[in-house]
């Protein structure tokens, strides 16, 4: 018995040694034993189980997207890889985006497990490193670039500005779209300032502290209101955000609300990048009543961001597109009086003398089963005379009966 116990202890010791000496991945955790698929050079529409893009390329066959493979030449920057940002990155990776640039300086915690995407074994890792490892395994065709710093500091803001200005799919070109998935006002203002300065279109997104509402907002510098044009109530009233949170009480979060908000964000990002459908300028979501408000916010002529004012002037100076109205071809009415061809005839109107219809020309061997007799004018006069005679005789008869 003791010999068996010694053998088991020796096996356990060997397993511990093996785990300690196992090679580590770049994220600091034991490398995943699962094998990632090989990279794919071109997207294929071939319908086979081994093609990860077959269902995406089907959008072309259904005339939703003209050329879906263009997505491989697009670069998107995601700022904030939390509840909304991580799911957004996951969806874009599965859609086959060409390049993802992730910004975040926070770490994965067990408190994040109520959200989607991250797993408990990633606790303690930086969010961008954990996300990059998972996303690369999901789709190795996507180029993923990570930046683990706070973009709101003066030094890091310049780095952020350079990255979104020159980090496109083609070196030296700007990214195609910036997605804001942050949870604080300072970071949103930093993204807003950078995009106004570089004239980049971007989406702002957010989920409320009570976790039952969310929104996305598409911001086109100069065309729609930037984030500084209509600041939230917290800033408009000069209230510190920290004073709104009671001590010991944290903001609530639901994976459902965050997943819905991320879905709206990615759906509209795809419509913008691939040029199909209608991109919503502002789309909200209220989970309590399933209410989805939509609106467009115009820029503020007195905006505090000077670059926003410059973009407004540039937008106003652009030539307005000329809309050519197509004149509808109106068909002439079937009847001069009404379009239904109905003609009203008074009851006391005299009957028109209609000529009998001509006998249609019949084919050889065919004949009419019935021919209506023609009414002559003499027959009509005789009928009227007979009726008059009958009426007179009846009156005489009545007079005779009364005299009896």
Curated annotation (Swiss-Prot):
GO terms for molecular function: ATP binding; metal ion binding; UFM1 activating enzyme activity. Disruption phenotype: RNAi-mediated knockdown shows aberrant neuromuscular junctions in the larval muscle and abnormal wings, locomotive defects and a shortened lifespan in the adult fly. RNAi-mediated knockdown in the nervous system results also in aberrant neuromuscular junctions characterized by reduced number of type Ib boutons and increased bouton size in the larval muscle. RNAi-mediated knockdown in adult neuronal tissue results in reduced adult lifespan and progressive locomoter defects due to neurodegeneration, when in combination with knockdown of Ufl1; brains show evidence of increased ER stress. It is found in: Cytoplasm; Nucleus; Golgi apparatus. The keyword Metal-binding applies. The keyword Nucleus applies. One of its GO terms (cellular component) is nucleus. Changing residue 325 to K: In strain: MEL18. Keywords: ATP-binding, Cytoplasm, Golgi apparatus, Metal-binding, Nucleotide-binding, Nucleus, Ubl conjugation pathway, Zinc. It holds the Pfam family ThiF. Residues 382-391 have a biased composition (Low complexity). InterPro entries: D-isomer_DH_CS1 (IPR029752), ThiF/MoeB/HesA (IPR045886), ThiF_NAD_FAD-bd (IPR000594), Ubiquitin-activating_enz (IPR035985). Residues 372-404 are annotated as: Disordered. Zn(2+) binds at residues 226, 229, 303, 308. Disulfide bonds: none annotated. Interacts (via C-terminus) with Ufc1. Interacts with Ufm1. E1-like enzyme which activates UFM1. Belongs to the ubiquitin-activating E1 family. UBA5 subfamily. This is Ubiquitin-like modifier-activating enzyme 5. It comes from Drosophila melanogaster.
């Amino acid at each position: 018995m003791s010999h068996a116990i010694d053998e088991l202890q020796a096996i356990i010791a060997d397993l511990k040694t093996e785990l300690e000496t196992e090679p580590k991945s770049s994220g600091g955790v034991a490398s995943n034993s699962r094998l990632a698929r090989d990279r794919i050079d071109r997207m294929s529409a071939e319908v086979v189980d081994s093609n990860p893009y077959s269902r995406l390329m089907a959008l072309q066959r259904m005339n939703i997207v003209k050329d879906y493979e263009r997505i491989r030449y697009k670069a998107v920057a995601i700022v904030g890889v939390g509840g909304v940002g991580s799911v957004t990155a996951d969806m874009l990776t599965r859609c086959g985006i060409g390049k993802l640039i992730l910004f975040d300086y926070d770490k994965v915690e067990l408190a994040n497990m109520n959200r989607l995407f991250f797993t408990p074994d990633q606790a303690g890792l930086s969010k961008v490193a954990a996300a990059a490892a998972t996303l690369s395994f999901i789709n190795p065709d996507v180029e993923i670039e990570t930046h683990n710093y706070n973009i709101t500091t003066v030094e890091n803001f310049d780095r952020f500005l350079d990255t979104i200005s020159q980090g496109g799919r083609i070196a030296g070109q700007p990214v195609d779209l910036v997605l804001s998935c942050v949870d604080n006002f300072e970071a949103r203002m930093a993204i807003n300032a950078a995009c106004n300065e570089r004239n980049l279109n971007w989406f702002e997104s957010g989920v409320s502290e009570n976790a039952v509402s969310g929104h996305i907002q598409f911001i086109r510098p100069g065309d729609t209101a930037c984030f500084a044009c209509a600041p939230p109530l917290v800033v408009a009233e000069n209230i510190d955000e920290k004073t709104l949170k009671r001590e010991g009480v944290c903001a609530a979060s639901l994976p459902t609300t965050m997943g819905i908000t991320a879905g709206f964000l990615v759906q509209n990002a795809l419509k913008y990048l691939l040029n199909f459908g209608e991109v919503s300028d502002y789309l909200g979501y209220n989970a309590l009543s399933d209410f989805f408000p939509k609106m467009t916010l115009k820029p503020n002529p007195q905006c505090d961001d000077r670059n926003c004012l410059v973009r407004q002037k540039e937008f106003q100076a652009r030539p307005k597109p000329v809309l050519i109205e197509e004149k509808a071809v109106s068909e002439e009415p079937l009847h001069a009086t009404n379009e239904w061809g109905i003609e009203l005839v008074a009851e006391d109107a005299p009957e028109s003398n209609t000529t009998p219809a001509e006998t249609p020309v019949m084919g050889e061997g065919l004949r009419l089963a019935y021919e209506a007799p023609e009414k002559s004018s003499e027959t009509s006069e005789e009928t009227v005379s007979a009726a008059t005679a009958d009426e007179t005789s009846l009156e005489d008869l009545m007079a005779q009966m009364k005299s009896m």
